[in-house]
């Protein structure tokens, strides 16, 4: 029987320390500049924290930007109730270790109505538990700027989003009504009720993220590294089969194999990949020959009626 205890140690598999090359240093400098600009321009910034690798890099950069002081804004985790167990344990340990002001929000309507990815489908579940939940949390905190970890190389709609992404009072995004950004000069002037999503990692790639994690020895959720884990194949994805809420459908068989995740989200909507990469070096080598986006492992991105751009227009991350 596999060990059911989540592996949450805040450290990475043994890796040779890599120096920060000029390319990564330039990306780091740009990201730190964006953090400081937003903190100076806006009254109530917040950082969206989804616990994944991009959020871990984002947090590391925020800590660098304001060192030796504490991170001067809270972290917001919109919890759907369906995250991997390892993610929640890692989140709590990270918040304690770095003395972070962590806000957790769960959409009370979704919880009361028992909205699940199994009963309502990925599109409705994401809209209610993530998009609606995020809007609720931003309104409750009266935040006028929210840092996010999106990168332009992830997906088409994110590729055309500016570093300062302006949102209406109801948090909607109009990609045709965004301001020009000249070099590193950002216009943060907003009207009452409007807000900005700021993306310090916009110009990073997935490989940049991993090389920076290696160079800076940034801890990650262990699910990013290959390990023998139980899974079921469903809708063309390998779904982790550790949570008792995952019921096998007719014809499904529980399997075990060496798998890992390139992206993390809600466990029923996030597919693993077969992999032997158990170290940072092996993950990077694997990514350097990858031919598909990491977002291919997200069920919510496969549904054309719930495409990423549509979600973002409505207020999604």
Curated annotation (Swiss-Prot):
Catalytic activity: sulfate + ATP + H(+) = adenosine 5'-phosphosulfate + diphosphate
Pathway: Sulfur metabolism; hydrogen sulfide biosynthesis; sulfite from sulfate: step 1/3
Region span, Disordered: 1-21, 298-317
Keywords: ATP-binding, Nucleotide-binding, Nucleotidyltransferase, Transferase
GO BP term, pick one: sulfate assimilation
SUPFAM superfamilies: Adenine nucleotide alpha hydrolases-like
UniProt GO MF annotations: ATP binding; sulfate adenylyltransferase (ATP) activity
E.C. number(s) listed in UniProt: 2.7.7.4
Family designation: Belongs to the PAPS reductase family. CysD subfamily.
Subunit structure comment from the entry: Heterodimer composed of CysD, the smaller subunit, and CysN.
Function: With CysN forms the ATP sulfurylase (ATPS) that catalyzes the adenylation of sulfate producing adenosine 5'-phosphosulfate (APS) and diphosphate, the first enzymatic step in sulfur assimilation pathway. APS synthesis involves the formation of a high-energy phosphoric-sulfuric acid anhydride bond driven by GTP hydrolysis by CysN coupled to ATP hydrolysis by CysD.
Name of this protein: Sulfate adenylyltransferase subunit 2
Organism listed in the record: Rhizobium leguminosarum bv. trifolii (strain WSM2304)
Gene (UniProt): cysD
């Amino acid at each position: 029987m596999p060990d059911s205890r989540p592996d949450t140690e805040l450290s990475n598999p043994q890796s040779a320390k890599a120096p920060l090359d000029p390319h990564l240093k330039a990306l780091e400098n740009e990201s730190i500049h964006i953090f400081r600009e937003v903190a100076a321009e806006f009254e109530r910034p917040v950082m969206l924290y989804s616990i994944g690798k991009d959020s871990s890099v984002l947090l590391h950069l925020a800590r660098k930007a304001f060192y030796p002081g504490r991170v001067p804004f809270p972290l917001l985790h919109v919890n759907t109730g369906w995250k991997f167990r390892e993610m929640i344990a890692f989140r709590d340990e990270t918040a304690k270790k770095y003395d972070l002001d962590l806000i957790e929000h769960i959409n009370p309507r979704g919880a009361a109505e028992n909205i699940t990815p199994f009963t309502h489908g990925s599109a409705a579940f994401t809209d209610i538990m993530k998009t609606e939940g995020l809007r609720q949390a931003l309104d409750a905190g009266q935040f006028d700027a929210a840092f996010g970890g999106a990168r332009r190389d992830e997906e088409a709609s994110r590729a055309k989003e500016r570093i300062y992404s302006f949102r209406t009072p109801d948090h909607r995004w109009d990609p045709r009504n965004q301001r020009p950004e000249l070099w590193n000069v950002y216009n943060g002037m907003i009207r009452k009720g409007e807000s900005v999503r700021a993306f310090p990692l916009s110009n990073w790639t997935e490989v940049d993220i991993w090389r920076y994690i290696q160079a800076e020895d940034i801890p990650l959720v262990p699910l990013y590294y290959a390990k023998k884990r139980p899974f079921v194949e469903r809708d063309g994805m390998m779904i982790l089969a550790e949570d008792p809420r995952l019921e096998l459908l007719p014809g499904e068989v529980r399997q075990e194999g060496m798998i890992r995740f390139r992206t993390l989200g809600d466990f029923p909507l996030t597919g693993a990949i077969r992999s032997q990469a158990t170290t940072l070096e092996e993950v990077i080598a694997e990514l350097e020959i990858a031919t598909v986006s990491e977002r291919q492992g997200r069920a919510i991105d496969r549904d054309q009626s719930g495409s990423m751009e549509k979600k973002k227009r409505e207020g999604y991350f």
